[in-house]
Amino acid sequence: ADLFTQYRPLFTGGLARLSQGVVFPQGYQAHAATETCPGHSTILTGAHPGNNGIIANNWFDLGLAREDKRVYCSEDPTVEGTSSASGRYAPSPQYLRVPTLGERMRAADPRSRVVSIAGKDRAVIMMGGRGIDESWW
């Protein structure tokens, strides 16, 4: 379902301004990592997965100090007692190596507010980056 189109008539204020923008219904990303986390991080940073640090939703890091070597794209594996396999992890943009659009907006104007809302933590974190004012998932 296209929720943006469905709820567009109800938008007011800043959200209504989205209707004045541009829509790319057949947008294309020139990289092979077609999972959510690398897709969101690529769109909101302008950098391909190899450069932005988010190569997949999950990958293995044999250098991790914990027994579980699987890494979730939006976790901080240095938080003790966490494991992506168990579902108990600390959400974090730790692996994101470049600034997001929100971070660049704030750098240009400190009055900018960065709000990231999505159905999953990885989408919120990859789209909002560091220093999110509000994050909901």
Name each model feature, range by range:
Residues 39-40, 44-49:
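Alpha-helix capping/hinge segments and adjacent helical runs
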Residues 9-11, 19, 34-37, 107-110:
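Extracellular/periplasmic catalytic domains that process cell-envelope and extracellular macromolecules
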Residues 5-10, 34, 91-99:
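Soluble non-cytosolic domains of exported or imported proteins
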Residues 24-41, 116-125:
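Short, solvent-exposed turn/loop segments enriched in Gly/Ser/Thr/Pro and often Arg
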Residues 1-22:
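Active-site-proximal N-terminal segment of extracellular/periplasmic enzymes that hydrolyze or transfer
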Residues 47-137:
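His/Asp/Glu-rich, glycine-adjacent segments
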Residues 1-5, 28-30, 86-92:
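Second-shell loop/turn segments in exported
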Residues 13-17, 41, 99, 103, ...:
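Solvent-exposed, polar/charged alpha-helical surfaces in well-ordered, non-transmembrane soluble domains
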